């Protein structure tokens, strides 16, 4: 049996057996909400992993409806699902539970500049690593409050003096959305950027005084995603566009103060963009880009066309050595 079909069969076998409560006792555990959300994702992507089996838009809608019938809510505050004590968010369906005592969420270390930690009241070493692609941030409507909720830009200041920190290159540490690649410095041909370039991840609250990994839990699934999955399945199946539009607007109402920013009739591209804006940094982009046919596209100034083999991952050698019956995926 195909592994993806096997997985869907396994999920269907347990979907009404696992616990259905939404409580502190079920937090971090596989529940009915989590199983049905995973099924909805599989059905939404069915034409990718099993095109011979046909589209499963109605199955996706049905699975989403089960989740929508449980006691999750769209939190009035977007940040409720990303604050340090986010275990009380009723929007999170399934999460990785982190704590400072046993290691956890290390996004602050990964994204912040070496000098940014004291500016934000943190006591950690940082890597000046992850930043957002400029065109991604610029795609947001300027009135979208999720920009400020998701990306860190602007000056990083010494809290004692109020002066802007200076980077090792002698430049003010003022984070910009733009990232300017500079070539010709290294023999390997890789480009360089200035240390302050790039909007940093600001989605998970940084805890003042933090001296290790953060304890913000990471939402694998949350209800906003389910709203958008159902909306997409409705549009793809030529279903109830009014309902799809309502679902998208529930999400947009939280992000905009201006009611004119609500949609009147959503398109697939509207939903694709809404997923990009709502779910920034949450790990959904790869699936979404593959499903919408944008994953292989060139990004001018950054990368050429991605080889089609990259639509699926290679099977690690360790797995193939352990099981000679496994055949490497095409192209690897």
Predicted regions span which residues?
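Extended, hydrophobic/aromatic-rich amphipathic alpha-helical segments that build helical scaffolds
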Residues: 1-18, 27-51, 55-68, 94, ...
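Generic detector of contiguous secondary-structure segments
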Residues: 1, 24-25, 180-183
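C-terminal substrate/ligand-recognition segments
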Residues: 153-251
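Helix-capping and short linker residues that terminate individual alpha-solenoid repeat units
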Residues: 12-20, 71-74, 256-257
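Acidic, serine/threonine- and proline-rich low-complexity regulatory regions
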Residues: 18-28, 76-79, 208-216
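Long, intrinsically disordered, low-complexity segments
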Residues: 6, 82-136, 210-220, 252, ...
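An aromatic- and glycine-enriched ligand-binding surface/loop that stacks and positions planar moieties
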Residues: 11, 29-181, 299
